[in-house]
């Protein structure tokens, strides 16, 4: 069993598991932190960004000044943002049989894999994962395509040039694998390969293994996966949460008795408590608005935004914010808000019961009805007419490199009355803000990450007790900034095995058994013999029939009677005739009694030596060697067949035939 690690990002994993003749890809996350190295794409022409000076090498060579621009001491690539893809050279991705998706954040690289690697298999995911994943991809494509950029920068990617660049460009990894965004045509083609599944649904893969999605408690439709055969079990835990938010709670019981547990997608902010972060978010938002400022919340169109809107729904009136407009701007804003209300079966129990009252499971429906929350596809059109300040704007992209958020950063960045509040943990907020410096607006960092922290995961591992744990190397040691915090790492026994990008891990786990069915008529013909009290054995002569990884023992064909004349050969004639087999032997040879038997039969000068696997009996006079081991006995003599047969018969006296 082998695990191929194709991604270096622990919360955006992409691994390939080879297990029992099947090749299974576990998630295909897309690392978007690479976009932080690029200049933002403004919706409206930005004189500030257009007039940034080009960057030149120290020797004065200016051939890079069209590709690289400098802003407040940072250097950025002036080109369409590119994304860091999973490894494509470590394994032939056309051999992947299936892809298992755990949540909508972990499927963003799907079009790159299904459309450009020769992949012909099936993708499995829950319906909310597919629908919300489609929205995220559609928004991403829309953000990139609506601001076309004429030039494409590639000179800086040359290894000899890259090492001369300042950080972080100099330290950027795998820049040769970075790619532009896919198209909607590729998105639709990739999503057409997905087969929808439900929680606890068992899916057979070629008769070899069975995969089952379990609720992970992190997002609508998010899943952990069980991959098992008749005698082995692998659990894949990715993006899980024990907090009571809007999704169904995590299914922990089904993870028990795993031979291997692959652990990914833990919280990116282990020291931040989500509840206190939400409290800080609300209080900072209220403070800014009361002082006449605007609040900008860079966000994804699904996920945490549902919980934030629910908290604000409860907070608005008590904080005196009922007259303040809330705007949600995204090409998929309307679809996202509607989807959240119709996936009732995937919600936690409290929200499911509201559906039958009838009452919308999320309160943002009421915010929309009362005009406190308005949603728009972009800043153009209706939004321009309805826009009034002070206000709160939820919009993407959290990287601040594309989307409507770029316009608001340019619009509000010069005033200290305004505040940008970062709630998504995927991007360093300091790096996200770098191309907007100098910045007068206030910046608040309230990362809300509900995924498992190290204390929770260590407790979980003690409860489910897998034989082996495998995880990214980032989880096996504290971060360099907090090297003294030994509690910020996975604690389990035996210690977890770690992996990194482009590494192949041989899992410490060997398959020992295979299930074989036996036909009833063959079972009737067996004659068991008791070899020990309570233990019986029977020999089986049969034909092993294997199809779709299912093995069946069938009765052997009866010997055909020879007939005169020539006959056309039939397909059944290819089956070999049943041969009369020699009896099998069982038992053990007690050395002391065997030596006594040899002496009784005239052998002398006998010497016994112990070995690691058994004993060696030397008949020095006859120049003969008898090796007695647990599973075999060898008689070695020099071309004396009579002596060999005589010794063989003495050995057989100690063994049972059946």
From Swiss-Prot:
InterPro entries: Beta_Casp, Integrator_9su, IntS9-like_C, Metallo-B-lactamas, RibonucZ/Hydroxyglut_hydro. This is Integrator complex subunit 9. GO terms for biological process: RNA polymerase II transcription initiation surveillance; snRNA 3'-end processing. Although strongly related to RNA-specific endonuclease proteins, it lacks the HXHXDH motif that binds zinc and participates in the catalytic center. Its function as endonuclease is therefore unsure. There is a cross-link at residue 58 (Glycyl lysine isopeptide (Lys-Gly) (interchain with G-Cter in SUMO2)). Component of the Integrator complex, composed of core subunits INTS1, INTS2, INTS3, INTS4, INTS5, INTS6, INTS7, INTS8, INTS9/RC74, INTS10, INTS11/CPSF3L, INTS12, INTS13, INTS14 and INTS15. The core complex associates with protein phosphatase 2A subunits PPP2CA and PPP2R1A, to form the Integrator-PP2A (INTAC) complex. INTS9 is part of the RNA endonuclease subcomplex, composed of INTS4, INTS9, INTS11 and inositol hexakisphosphate (InsP6). Interacts with WDR73; interaction is required for the assembly of the RNA endonuclease subcomplex in the cytoplasm. Its main location: nucleus. It is found in: Nucleus; Cytoplasm. A motif (Nuclear localization signal) lies at residues 566-570. Keywords: Cytoplasm, Isopeptide bond, Nucleus, Ubl conjugation. Residues 548-573 are annotated as: Disordered. It holds the Pfam family IntS9_C. The lineage of its organism: Eukaryota, Metazoa, Chordata, Craniata, Vertebrata. SMART domains: Beta-Casp. GO terms for cellular component: cytoplasm; INTAC complex; integrator complex; nucleus. Component of the integrator complex, a multiprotein complex that terminates RNA polymerase II (Pol II) transcription in the promoter-proximal region of genes. PANTHER family: INTEGRATOR COMPLEX SUBUNIT 9 (PTHR46094:SF1).
